Amino acid sequence: MLRRESIGDKYLNKSEQGFSLLELMAVILIIAIAATMTMPLLQHQIAAREIDTIARRFIAHAHFARQQAIHLGQPFLLMPTVRGDWSSGWVVKSGCIGKSANAACIEKRWFIQGNIQPIHFKSNGKQFIDPNTGKKGILFNASGAAKTAQGGFVANRLVLGHERVPDLERQMILGSGGRWRICDPATDAKRCH
C-alpha cells in the first residue's frame, strides 16, 4: 500500500512494510509440507506413549495386588475381566481365591480396568495362563509371590500392540524374582529374551 507524504510542496510515494499475498502463500505451503512430513512420526510417538501408559498402569495394578496380598495376608488375583481377554480389561480382587477359599468368604474388587482400545494384548507370549486350569491371571499369595492357582511359580510376559501402528509393541516381563520390566524388542531385543 502506498502512502503519500508531502515535503514542502512536493509529494513522495512511500511504501509501507509488509508481505505480499504471494509471500504469505509460500510460507503457508512450506508449513503444510513440513506438517505432512512429520505427521507419521508424530502418530508413531503418540501410539508409543499410549502403549507405555497402559503397560505402566498394568504393572502398577500388579504391584498394588502384590502389596495388598502382603499387607492383608491373603491372596490377591489380577485377572482379565472377560473370559481370558486381557484387552477387554482386568480386575484386581481378593477373597474367595485359591485352594483354601471357604464358604463364608466375600469377594472384593479393588480395581477394574476397562477396555484399553486402541491398545491390545498380542497372542504371542504366555499371557499368564495356568497350565492346570487354562485360566489367565496372576495370583499373589500372602508372602507376595506370584503363583498359579495350583501353586506353581509364574515368570511370564505379556505383549502389547497398537491397532494403528501394527509393528509397534512393548513386552511386560515378570521375572523369577517378582520384578517387572518393560522392553521394546525393536530397540533392545537382547533384553526382551
Predicted regions span which residues?
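N-terminal helix-rich module
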Residues: 2-11, 37, 43-57, 67, ...
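Generic recognition of well-ordered alpha-helical segments
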Residues: 60-64
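Alpha-helical hydrophobic helix detector
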Residues: 25-41
